[in-house]
């Protein structure tokens, strides 16, 4: 089933959603796949990022999360990570600022003692009715958050990463097929996929794996905070499974791609978690 119609102000908050997303990995049991690894998750305050941060902690990793200003959501993520007896570093700020992209890496290394795993997950979207409605400011902001921050954070992180480390990027089904009302967003997600392929080739000689998860509809604060209420109603019903994914259902894909015991020969791949929808190619 889809979700009931609702809307809230940007950037969106978990507690204001009905129903709240399942993003605490309550039923997930770790197996030490990421024992003593140190991870940075952008957009880690809620949604997919929260579920990934908690799953990594359950697998034995310490985690830093970067987010804009959703402090209450971020503190809840920290509680969940620390409940697993792992460290959590909170890094608020605007990843659209190139200097802050470097700072979150520096603060992660300072707080955790190093950096082994990077999850580029932060995202911004603003639907439009017509292509002409996309202003230069919106176009540039969407690329700045969704694509430029990925590269800037990764560029800074590479100074601290080496053999056996991993990068996992979050794209979208819209990067595979496009979306008439999310033109700029879809363009960034397609760019992330191509960038993943290229970075995987470039970093393979260093022993750093780079992969991507491209989800279909997912129930996160991004949806009611950016989409009109009438489009939120029934969100996700179009896929064969007739519902959106919960963040908890996607986080294990990130664990798989981050864990050398599970995916040491996998790099330059995209996991498309689409609820039964198929893409050409």
Feature-to-residue mapping (PLM):
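Catalytic Tyr-X3-Lys loop
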Residues: 132-151, 168, 192, 241
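The beta1-alpha1 cofactor-binding region of Rossmann-like NAD(H)/NADP(H)-dependent oxidoreductases
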Residues: 71, 92-105, 136, 248-249
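Residue(s) in the substrate-gating loop at a strand-loop-helix junction
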Residues: 172
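Short C-terminal tail/terminal secondary-structure segment
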Residues: 4, 17, 25-26, 128, ...
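C-terminal substrate-recognition "lid" of short-chain dehydrogenase/reductases
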Residues: 160, 208, 244-273, 278
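Alpha-helical segment proximal to the catalytic Tyr-Lys
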Residues: 159, 201-205
């Amino acid at each position: 089933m889809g979700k009931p119609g609702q809307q809230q102000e940007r950037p969106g908050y978990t507690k204001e959603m009905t129903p709240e997303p399942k993003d605490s990995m309550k039923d997930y049991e770790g197996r030490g796949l990421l024992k003593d690894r140190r991870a940075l998750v952008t957009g880690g305050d809620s949604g997919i990022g929260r579920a990934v941060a908690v799953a990594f902690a359950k697998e034995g990793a310490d985690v830093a999360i970067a987010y804009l200003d959703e402090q209450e959501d971020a503190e809840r993520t920290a509680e969940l990570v620390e409940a697993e007896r792992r460290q959590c570093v909170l890094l608020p700020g605007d990843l659209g600022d190139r200097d802050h992209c470097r700072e979150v890496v520096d603060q992660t290394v300072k707080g955790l003692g190093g950096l082994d795993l990077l999850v580029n997950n932060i995202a911004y979207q603003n639907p439009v009715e017509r292509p002409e409605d996309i202003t230069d400011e919106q176009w540039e902001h969407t690329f700045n958050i969704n694509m430029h921050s990925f590269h800037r954070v990764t560029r800074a992180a590479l100074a601290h990463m080496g053999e056996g480390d991993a990068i996992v990027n979050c794209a979208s089904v819209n990067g595979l097929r496009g979306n008439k009302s999310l033109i700029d967003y879809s363009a960034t997600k397609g760019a992330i996929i191509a960038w993943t392929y290229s970075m995987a080739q470039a970093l393979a000689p260093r022993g750093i794996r780079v992969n991507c998860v491209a989800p279909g509809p997912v129930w996160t604060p991004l949806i009611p905070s950016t989409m009109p209420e009438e489009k939120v109603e029934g969100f996700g019903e179009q896929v064969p499974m007739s519902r959106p994914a919960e963040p908890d259902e996607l986080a294990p894909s990130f664990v798989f791609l981050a864990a050398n015991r599970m995916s040491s020969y996998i790099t330059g791949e995209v996991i498309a978690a689409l609820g039964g929808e198929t893409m050409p190619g």
